[in-house]
């Protein structure tokens, strides 16, 4: 898989969207009503996209070592989650998620249960997900990806 600006952009957008879907489904089920977990009312959770790109760029060489890949993905995603939680709390003066009730948590920002999940999801994305995603994107007709032509506004003075 070739990582370039386009492929990293695809990984970022798709994983941001899939993260939003997962977060929204879980929050909706737990709350009993629709809960949009996206950023700025859009269908994206940017931490998932950012972490997806980080893992793709950093750990592609570990594809032949799945155990090391798992622990690398787990650590990187957990650090990203902790940093994001701290930044969001500092910027918005509220905790966006709280794992204080879970075993083996660090200040309620991260916990072992989700770190293991991030490790498994990160490993799956690096081993298979990114390749499948980019193969699917390669099936999109080129004309759909071309930017629309920009025509200058008609001049009021001739």
Regions found by a protein language model. Name each.
Residues 1-158:
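Aromatic-rich, lipid-facing transmembrane alpha helices and their immediate juxtamembrane interface loops
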């Amino acid at each position: 898989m070739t990582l370039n600006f386009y492929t990293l952009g695809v990984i970022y957008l798709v994983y941001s969207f899939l993260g939003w879907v997962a977060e929204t489904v879980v929050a909706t089920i737990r709350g009993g009503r629709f809960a949009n977990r996206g950023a700025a009312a859009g269908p994206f959770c940017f931490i998932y996209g950012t972490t997806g790109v980080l893992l793709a760029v950093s750990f592609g060489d570990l594809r032949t070592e799945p155990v090391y890949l798992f622990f690398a993905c787990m650590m990187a995603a957990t650090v990203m989650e902790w940093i994001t939680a701290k930044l969001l709390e500092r910027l918005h003066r509220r905790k966006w998620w709280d794992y204080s009730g879970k075993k083996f948590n660090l200040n309620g920002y991260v916990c072992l249960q989700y770190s293991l999940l991030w490790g498994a999801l990160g490993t799956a994305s690096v081993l298979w997900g990114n390749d499948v995603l980019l193969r699917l994107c390669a099936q999109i007709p080129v004309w759909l990806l071309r930017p629309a032509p920009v025509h200058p506004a008609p001049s009021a003075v001739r």
